[in-house]
Swiss-Prot record:
The gene is uppP. It is a multi-pass membrane protein. Its EC number is 3.6.1.27. This is Undecaprenyl-diphosphatase. GO terms for biological process: cell wall organization; peptidoglycan biosynthetic process; regulation of cell shape; response to antibiotic. NCBIfam families: PRK00281.3-3. It catalyses: di-trans,octa-cis-undecaprenyl diphosphate + H2O = di-trans,octa-cis-undecaprenyl phosphate + phosphate + H(+). Catalyzes the dephosphorylation of undecaprenyl diphosphate (UPP). Confers resistance to bacitracin. One of its GO terms (molecular function) is undecaprenyl-diphosphatase activity.
Length: 266
């Protein structure tokens, strides 16, 4: 396959599936199996940087608010308002989520060789069930004020989201709603907690960058990143709209359809 077409497909799939609750890693594995398209480490780094840039741009005002309140807290030059305290709690929550996500992610990384194609399809079904359950407006716990417990549960779920076929955004939003957070807040927690995880992952992969074979030139790499960025902006807006309008069951239907089609083809 021509490299230009390959990077366009990879950029499209990464941009769309990183934010929609359909598992980007699961879809990239499907590309590898059926279209013989693999994801070199250097390209993986560029694509993930492009998608995290989408989150930063989309939540730029919210991120600026959090940065300013953190600086205000460090300098202690003025009294903290109730809103400031709420923002500080969100920062603490994201830090706790990141810590437990890293622990689970490291554990899962050690066993990634055991992930079979059938397991990925099973995980697609698990994700579809979680998305369907979100539409029931479940609220089993009311622990949203317990920052540590909330960070623990969401962090574990986000770590599990590293498994191919499990949607990171889907499982973290499910966990947040389970804890009693609103849909809007759950979405915010899910996407903001993605930022430190992606940057941490890019940092760990940086050394591997110089050990990998460069099969794409700089133009092709940048082209793929641009496509990932453009479609990422589209998909994050679409996901926000569909979550607010209780339309996530569409993604459940999509994932079940993908699994059925794959079983038919295989």
């Amino acid at each position: 396959m021509d490299n230009i077409l390959r990077v366009i497909i990879l950029g499209f799939v990464q941009g769309i599936s990183e934010f929609l609750p359909i598992s980007s890693s699961g879809h990239l594995l499907l590309l590898k199996k059926f279209m013989n398209i693999d994801l070199p480490i250097v390209f993986d780094i560029y694509l993930h940087f492009a998608t995290v840039l989408v989150v930063i741009i989309y939540y730029r005002r919210r991120i600026l608010e959090l940065v300013m309140v953190f600086i205000k807290f460090i300098l202690r030059k003025s009294k903290m308002t109730e809103l400031d305290s709420s923002n500080l709690n969100l920062i603490l929550l994201i830090l706790i989520i990141t810590f437990f996500t890293a622990l689970i992610g490291i554990f899962i990384e050690k066993f990634k060789v055991l992930f079979t194609f059938k397991l990925v399809l099973f995980n697609f079904i698990v994700t579809s069930i979680l998305l369907f359950l979100i539409e029931f407006r479940i609220k089993i716990f009311n622990f949203k004020k317990n920052i540590f417990f909330s960070g623990l549960l969401i962090g574990i779920m986000q770590g599990i989201g590293a498994m191919p076929g499990i949607s990171r955004s889907g499982i973290t939003i499910f966990a947040s709603i389970l804890l009693g957070f609103s849909r809007t807040k759950s979405l915010e927690i899910s996407f903001l907690s993605l930022i430190p995880i992606v940057f941490g992952s890019l940092f760990l992969k940086y050394n591997d960058l110089f050990k990998s074979d460069i099969i794409f030139n700089i133009f092709e790499i940048n082209l793929g990143a641009i496509f990932a960025f453009i479609f990422g902006l589209f998909s994050i807006s679409l996901f926000v709209k569909m979550l607010k309008n209780s339309k996530l069951y569409y993604f459940s239907i999509y994932l079940v359809s993908v699994v059925s089609l794959v079983y038919f083809l295989v």
